[in-house]
Amino acid sequence: MNPNQKIITIGSVSLTIATICFLMQIAILVTTVTLHFKQYECDSPANNQVMPCEPIIIERNITEIVYLTNTTIEKEICPKLVEYRNWSKPQCKITGFAPFSKDNSIRLSAGGDIWVTREPYVSCDPGKCYQFALGQGTTLDNKHSNDTIHDRTPHRTLLMNELGVPFHLGTRQVCIAWSSSSCHDGKAWLHVCVTGYDKNATASFIYDGRLVDSIGSWSKNILRTQESECVCINGTCTVVMTDGSASERADTKILFIEEGKIVHISPLSGSAQHVEECSCYPRYPGVRCVCRDNWKGSNRPIVDINVKDYSIASSYVCSGLVGDTPRKNDRSSSSYCRNPNNEKGNHGVKGWAFDDGNDVWMGRTISEESRSGYETFKVIGGWSTPNSKLQINRQVIVDSDNRSGYSGIFSVEGKSCINRCFYVELIRGREQETRVWWTSNSIVVFCGTSGTYGTGSWPDGADINLMPI
């Protein structure tokens, strides 16, 4: 090869290499620009249009680092949309209940700073469960805990912690309240908080950490609400509120709330005579509540709420094994589905039940007269057959020698079904235990199971003689 040919060959090779390098630089530039703009866009599968990421509520923020030669590009993966809960899955089939959580608040109060509380409940967002209670504005080992048997003071606040975490000094005080309800609509928490004078109280509606709406007492006689979770379906949350006498006719209303704003109020209708402290659960497409009749019945009233047209129906649990306390013994008690049974109806305790086809699962104190012990069972035909009394799958949660208190339901959505869980308030201190001057509680929590289970008793467990006075 002569010198001219060598020069031509070397030049051709150099030109080829230069062309390849030029094309690679163009490819890198195009990729860089594309990824840079991609981090601000999401592809919407519904209509193939591009929409910005910023206004979308997100569950998590994931950043990937992509390396191209000497260039570092941060690419944000657009998160999935957070949607309202609709609770459309079926109810889980269960054989009974298994232990889930216990906070041991009273035992821990013997040596630590734990809030004095009552009226606890549990509610869950889509990822985690929380326990709530109405605090008395004091810890137990504190002279302010004297005489905390009283229900309504301006110092009471709604407390919120992860389930299983006792209410320590770092606990968040969500709002001022001596009566409350809370629920998560899939996007944010709604808290209904009642406080003020007995004859002119205020209910505040707090959504996503902001006060959105309020309503004043309509009967000027202790406006009050559920003391357990409310329920939200497709962005509409329902809460049952009562104002009026605790031992005669009262004025109950069902409030419909969207993102903290009251959008409709329906009066109670149907055959229920007195409704307080409802334990509510989603029963798609509506909401169902089992409540406390503090006037005429030891059988529990049912309130059915239609979220779409705001209509209300009410009746009573059919089971002749009734759920309130005090009550007649099981041989003598009765219920015929429509009306209160007029059996030891005056006074009562918050409780729960839920339908399982024609049957009913329910919990109640073991004692017929006092808030002692706690049991659960299923009554065959108890939802549809008047005065049905065939009991199966009985479990003791708290033995009859130990104190219980309020109880209520909460629902947990699984992959294929909705599970029902319940909590039991374990009251300690006054009035029964007069060695001390305070009244407070711990809780125990069980959830439905399709498996097998054993036996036991899960009382509060604190030795009152070791407790601060």
Swiss-Prot record:
<feature type="disulfide bond">
    <location>
        <begin position="183"/>
        <end position="230"/>
    </location>
</feature>
<dbReference type="GO" id="GO:0046761">
    <property type="term" value="P:viral budding from plasma membrane"/>
</dbReference>
<feature type="binding site">
    <location>
        <position position="324"/>
    </location>
    <ligand>
        <name>Ca(2+)</name>
    </ligand>
</feature>
<keyword id="KW-1032">Host cell membrane</keyword>
<keyword id="KW-1043">Host membrane</keyword>
<dbReference type="InterPro" id="IPR036278">
    <property type="entry name" value="Sialidase_sf"/>
</dbReference>
<feature type="region of interest" description="Hypervariable stalk region">
    <location>
        <begin position="36"/>
        <end position="88"/>
    </location>
</feature>
<keyword id="KW-0326">Glycosidase</keyword>
<feature type="disulfide bond">
    <location>
        <begin position="278"/>
        <end position="291"/>
    </location>
</feature>
<keyword id="KW-0378">Hydrolase</keyword>
<keyword id="KW-0472">Membrane</keyword>
<keyword id="KW-0812">Transmembrane</keyword>
<feature type="glycosylation site" description="N-linked (GlcNAc...) asparagine; by host">
    <location>
        <position position="402"/>
    </location>
</feature>
<keyword id="KW-1015">Disulfide bond</keyword>
<dbReference type="GO" id="GO:0046872">
    <property type="term" value="F:metal ion binding"/>
</dbReference>
<keyword id="KW-0946">Virion</keyword>
<keyword id="KW-0479">Metal-binding</keyword>
<dbReference type="InterPro" id="IPR033654">
    <property type="entry name" value="Sialidase_Influenza_A/B"/>
</dbReference>
<dbReference type="GO" id="GO:0004308">
    <property type="term" value="F:exo-alpha-sialidase activity"/>
</dbReference>
<feature type="glycosylation site" description="N-linked (GlcNAc...) asparagine; by host">
    <location>
        <position position="61"/>
    </location>
</feature>
<feature type="region of interest" description="Head of neuraminidase">
    <location>
        <begin position="91"/>
        <end position="469"/>
    </location>
</feature>
<feature type="binding site">
    <location>
        <position position="297"/>
    </location>
    <ligand>
        <name>Ca(2+)</name>
    </ligand>
</feature>
<dbReference type="GO" id="GO:0055036">
    <property type="term" value="C:virion membrane"/>
</dbReference>
<feature type="binding site">
    <location>
        <position position="152"/>
    </location>
    <ligand>
        <name>substrate</name>
    </ligand>
</feature>
<dbReference type="GO" id="GO:0016020">
    <property type="term" value="C:membrane"/>
</dbReference>
<feature type="region of interest" description="Involved in apical transport and lipid raft association">
    <location>
        <begin position="11"/>
        <end position="33"/>
    </location>
</feature>
<feature type="disulfide bond">
    <location>
        <begin position="232"/>
        <end position="237"/>
    </location>
</feature>
<feature type="transmembrane region" description="Helical">
    <location>
        <begin position="10"/>
        <end position="30"/>
    </location>
</feature>
<feature type="glycosylation site" description="N-linked (GlcNAc...) asparagine; by host">
    <location>
        <position position="146"/>
    </location>
</feature>
<feature type="glycosylation site" description="N-linked (GlcNAc...) asparagine; by host">
    <location>
        <position position="70"/>
    </location>
</feature>
<feature type="binding site">
    <location>
        <position position="292"/>
    </location>
    <ligand>
        <name>substrate</name>
    </ligand>
</feature>
<dbReference type="InterPro" id="IPR001860">
    <property type="entry name" value="Glyco_hydro_34"/>
</dbReference>
<protein>
    <recommendedName>
        <fullName>Neuraminidase</fullName>
        <ecNumber>3.2.1.18</ecNumber>
    </recommendedName>
</protein>
<keyword id="KW-0325">Glycoprotein</keyword>
<dbReference type="GO" id="GO:0020002">
    <property type="term" value="C:host cell plasma membrane"/>
</dbReference>
<feature type="disulfide bond">
    <location>
        <begin position="124"/>
        <end position="129"/>
    </location>
</feature>
<feature type="topological domain" description="Intravirion">
    <location>
        <begin position="1"/>
        <end position="9"/>
    </location>
</feature>
<comment type="subunit">
    <text>Homotetramer.</text>
</comment>
<feature type="disulfide bond">
    <location>
        <begin position="92"/>
        <end position="417"/>
    </location>
</feature>
<feature type="topological domain" description="Virion surface">
    <location>
        <begin position="31"/>
        <end position="469"/>
    </location>
</feature>
<feature type="glycosylation site" description="N-linked (GlcNAc...) asparagine; by host">
    <location>
        <position position="86"/>
    </location>
</feature>
<feature type="glycosylation site" description="N-linked (GlcNAc...) asparagine; by host">
    <location>
        <position position="200"/>
    </location>
</feature>
